[in-house]
Design a protein with these regions (language model features):
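Short glycine-enriched loops at secondary-structure junctions
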Residues: 11-14, 190-195, 241
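Glycine-rich phosphate/diphosphate-binding loops that line cofactor/substrate pockets in enzymes
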Residues: 51-54
Length: 267
């Protein structure tokens, strides 16, 4: 039985940086900030639609979950508790920045039934991270990943982006090598989509940012799928989901509504 997620989107409120590639409200398709009642409503609805809640995680995505105000983070976590304790959902999955992980935060997550933590690494090149205004370093990613794994109660997920400003084939393969060395259970691979209203969009319009060839990115992602399979790492996402909002805001990059299928067709 495969696992599934019930997603609760937490907008840009938790992100301390506006990364060069990010227009989070475009990606999530919403500006609404969810509160406890929203979490309960979404979970209640899911109970009527999901076949096996024991294989379903309540997932807080869309922003940097551990960077939101502490009271708000606890509000959302507490709202989900009854569905785990009483209704036997599998647990809670969150995504966050690597520089917002600490023992204090992990203690809170552990005590509130968080079972999976995904870190937005994006690149394992400090040059690429700085060029794309990420606001953290490779060392931050490595430190956070190791700390998460040391608890023994969290599944580690890592997210990487392909084709960022200042990246190339060599940096992508270096990023993969360093991510694989951290032994995550899951990875998400997002080829860059250049969105209107972002710094990356401005660099693209000016000609300063020249993306890699689309076919080259497909080849790289195809290779990463093969390597992940060899290592037993589950690629749970490859490419942004098909979205009318994304398509309307897209200036360029590596978007296809069936991007994963394109890559799998190369193997």
């Amino acid at each position: 039985m495969g696992h599934s997620n019930i997603s609760v989107f937490v907008p840009h409120i938790g992100c301390p940086h506006m990364c060069a590639f990010c227009n989070q409200r475009t990606i999530t398709g919403t500006e609404k900030i969810p509160h406890a009642d929203d979490v309960k409503r979404i979970c209640t609805q899911a109970m009527n639609e999901v076949k096996d809640v024991s294989q379903t995680e309540i997932a807080f995505f869309g922003g940097s979950f551990t960077a939101v105000p502490r009271e708000y983070m606890l509000e959302l976590l507490c709202a989900a508790q009854e569905f785990i304790v009483n209704d036997k959902f599998k647990g809670i999955r969150i995504s966050t920045r690597p520089d917002y992980i600490s023992t204090e935060i992990l203690d809170i997550l552990r005590d509130n039934h968080v079972t999976a933590i995904e870190l937005g690494a994006q690149s394992m090149s400090d040059v690429v991270l700085e060029a794309n205004e990420r606001g953290h370093t490779v060392q931050d990613v490595e430190n956070a990943a190791k700390l998460i794994k040391s608890y023994g109660c969290f599944d580690l997920g890592l997210q990487m982006m392909i084709g960022l400003y200042k990246s190339n084939r060599e940096t992508e393969l270096e990023t993969w090598s360093k991510i694989a060395a951290l032994s995550p259970k899951t990875v998400r691979i997002y080829p860059v989509v250049i969105l209107n209203g972002t710094r990356l969009g401005e660099l693209y319009k000016s000609g300063e940012y020249k993306p890699m060839d689309f076919d080259e990115v497909v080849k790289i992602c195809s290779y990463l799928l093969t390597e992940a399979d060899k290592l037993g790492i589950d690629v749970i996402k490859l490419g942004l989901h098909a979205s009318e909002v994304v398509e309307e805001q897209m200036l360029g990059g590596f978007y296809h509504p069936a991007f994963r299928e394109l890559c799998e067709g190369r193997n």
